[in-house]
Amino acid sequence: MKVLYDTILKAKYTGRPNRFVVTLDLNGESVLAHLPNPGRMWELLFTGVTMYIVPHDKPDAKTKYRVVGIERNGVVIMLDTNYSNDVAQHLIENKLIPGWEEWRVVRREYTVKLHGTSSRFDLLLTNDKGHEFLLEVKSCTLFSKTGAMFPDAITERGRKHLLHLKELQNEGYHTGVLFLVQWDKAVSYTHLTLPTN
């Protein structure tokens, strides 16, 4: 697997002014960092928790740093959702998902339109029989002691994707959702139904 970051720094979490920005203590200096994961992460974001950041690669970025991970009980959890598709593609190409050995990735960010509804899915897979498999990749960062749960926040976009996947399945497509559970102690998974208000 490729090296994702040249330089990784450790900082301490101090606050979250909005869904996409956190304040951190970096060696005594207060800094802002972009948080690419908009989930609630209530079980992860505690004052003083160690976060892993990298210098922002975009010169016009609003923050100097970008969050890539967080530590929980000595385990580093990847929060950089920009790389979720890379991880999924690595797992598929190296045949590390039992039952998916016949599939290979042919496109990323693939848009499908059906009955006037258009959705962009993370990966388009194919096999030697020419079948297509539309895959949505979700990064799961909500955990109990031994369980993984998803989602940790209401997402209309995510709901739309799942409903569209179901419609496409009814039209004959192979469809699926791959949950990247980043908690090695998880032995079970629960889909949460969140209140809409």
List each language-model region with its residue ranges.
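A short acidic/basic microdomain associated with nuclease active sites
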Residues: 97-115
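Short aromatic-glycine-enriched beta-strand elements
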Residues: 19-23
